[in-house]
Structure formats: structure tokens, C-alpha cells
Amino acid sequence: MSDYSFSPTGEKFLLPEQDDYSKEFERLKELVNRQRALGREIVLVMGIGFVGAVMAAVVADAQDGKGNPTKFVIGMQRPSTRSFWKIPLINRGLSPISTEDPEVALMIERCVNKKKTLTATFTYDALKLADVVIVDVQCDYLKESLGNVRSGQTEMKALEESFEIIAQNISP
């Protein structure tokens, strides 16, 4: 039985199957080779939620003094039923988040469809291609009492798992 991820608008996306991973890594290697030939640094943003999607767009929009792009960004999201849908949306040039700042959606569209400096993926093998890794995963702070930020705890499971994935996929 196949698993699906549903966007907030109800669009249905089939989760990747085992043979999709090698195809996806080949797609990324081709993109990265072209971007390196243009002299661009490869940046991987791990997590493309509210913070990560904006970070990926801002970095992908970076340019030198002559207006030339300097970075190629791979936004990486785990392929879960809860969040996989963000990947195909970004790859269409659509923002996976709602924000009051209209520039975010414009920047994502520009970087994906015009500048070609942003893509999204589900494969952790993408880490092997990165020059720089930015980790933007959810770390909730659970307050025990209002007005006292010193009493509470941070839920760091996603961050710890991210570090394990990074360690398994990059060389020192």
C-alpha cells in the first residue's frame, strides 16, 4: 500500500519508493555539477518548514556585486506523510508556508523558476554534495510557567536526529 502526503490545500503527493532515491540523487548530482561549473557554492538547508523555507530562499537569492548568483541551495525535507508535500511545492516555485511578507513567495518563485538556484529533495544523500549545511528543524520550547523562560525544556529530538543523519552522510 502506498503512502501519501497531503498539502494544506488537500493536494495529494505519493511518498517516494526505494528506487526513487537513486534517481533523485542522480538528478541532484547533475544540478550540482552544473552549478559548480558556474562557480556557485552548494548550500543544503535541512528542514524546509517556516524557518528553513525562508532561509533557503534568502540564501538562494544571494548574489555578488555584479548581480550574479553565488549559491545553489538544496532544501531537504524528510519524506514523511506530514511534510513531504513541501518538496514538490518548492520545486514548482511555490512557497510551502504562509506568511504576511509577500517577498517570501516571490523569492521562492524567482529562485526556482528564473535564477535556477533553489531545489528541494527528500534524499539524505544530498548531504554528500553540500559545501555548507544549515540545520533548520523544529525545536519546541515547552514553558512550565508564564513569564519565566528559565523553567521549561526544549524538545530537541528532531535536532538530535538531524545531527545523526548529517554524521552518516558527510565526511569529516
Where are these regions (language model features)?
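Structural/interface elements that position substrates and couple domains in central-metabolism enzymes
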Residues: 1-172
